[in-house]
Amino acid sequence: MTIALGKLTKDEKDLFDTMDDWLRRDRFIFVGWSGLLLFPCAYFALGGWFTGTTFVTSWYTHGLASSYLEGCNFLTAAVSTPANSLAHSLLFLWGPEAQGDFTRWCQLGGLWTFVALHGAFGLIGFMLRQFELARSVQLRPYNAIAFSAPIAVFISVFFIYPLGQSGWFFAPSFGVAAIFRFILFFQGFHNWTLNPFHMMGVAGVLGAALLCAIHGATVENTLFEDGDGANTFRAFNPTQSEETYSMVTANRFWSQIFGVAFSNKRWLHFFMLFVPVTGLWMSALGVVGLALNLRAYDFVSQEIRAAEDPEFETFYTKNILLNEGIRAWMAAQDQPHENLIFPEEVLPRGNAL
C-alpha cells in the first residue's frame, strides 16, 4: 500500500479565499478584514456627528441650543447626551422610546448613542487594522498596542463612567465646549485633579511631549552630513545604508547635560512608547474608579482646621471650596429636571469673603 504525504490542495477557491484576496489586495488605501468594521463605523460616527451638530437641538434633553441651525459655532455645537430619564437605554431608532420616528429619536438624544457606539467600534477597527497590516508585513504589533491607550480612555469616559452613574446623561457630549463642561463637572463632583490616576495621566502625556521634543531635537542635532545640500532635507538620501544620526554623539551630549543618557536605541524608543501609553491607561483606570464614585485624596485635617480657624487656609482648602461652588452652581443648571434651588445662604463662601 502506498501512502502519499503532502498538503491537500483545493482545486478552486471558496468564498472566503475570494474575499480574502480582494480585501487584502495591495492598493492605495488598504481595506483588509478590519476595514469591514472600521470604514462603516467611522462613516456612521462622523456622519452622525456632522448631522447632529448641524441640525439637532438639545432643548429636550439639556435645555440647550447645540446646533449650527440654532446659532452655535464650531466650538459650542455638540451632539448631546440623552435625557437622564432615559437612563442606559441604547436608544435604537426602532426601540420603544422613538418607535421608528427619526425626528423624535433625534430629540431624545439617539444620535449620541449612535455616534458613541459607532465611534467606539470604529476605533477598535482602526486598532485591528494596525494589527492586520503589521502581521501582513511581518512587523511587531506595538503600534496597535500603543493605540489601545486612547481607546481605553474613550471607553472609560464615554461608556464605563456613565454606566456607573444614573445614565448616559452624565457622559460627555460630543463637542468642544461640551467636553470643557464635562471636565469642570469632573473637578467639581470628583476632585479629579487631585486623583493619583489623573496625576499619572498628566505625567504620561506631558512627559511624552517632553521626550518627543528632546528626541526630535537630538536627532536633528546629530544628523550625519551625507550630502552637500543647504539643509538637512536636501542632504537626506532615502536609500542610505548607514544610520541617519550619531547615537554616540547624542549619548556624549546628554551625558554631559544630565550626567545620564540613553545608550541603547531600543530602550530609548521603548521608553518613549511606555510613558504615554502607561499614563493614558492609568488615567482610564482612574475614570473607572470615578464610575464607582471612588474618591481622590482627602486631607481632612486641613479641612477641619480651616473650618475652625478663619486665618488658616491652604491651596487644598481653597480648591475644596471651589469644588463646592462648582457643585452648587452647576447642579441647578446642569440638571434642570431635578428643579434644584439653592438659597443664597447655602452657597459656599471662602474665608476671604
Curated annotation (Swiss-Prot):
MF terms (GO), sorted A to Z: chlorophyll binding; electron transporter, transferring electrons within the cyclic electron transport pathway of photosynthesis activity; iron ion binding; oxygen evolving activity
Positions contributing to a plastoquinone binding: 215, 262
Catalyzed reaction equations: 2 a plastoquinone + 4 hnu + 2 H2O = 2 a plastoquinol + O2
Principal subcellular localization: plastid
EC number in record: 1.10.3.9
Subunit structure: PSII is composed of 1 copy each of membrane proteins PsbA, PsbB, PsbC, PsbD, PsbE, PsbF, PsbH, PsbI, PsbJ, PsbK, PsbL, PsbM, PsbT, PsbX, PsbY, PsbZ, Psb30/Ycf12, at least 3 peripheral proteins of the oxygen-evolving complex and a large number of cofactors. It forms dimeric complexes.
Listed name of the protein: Photosystem II D2 protein
Organism: Cuscuta reflexa
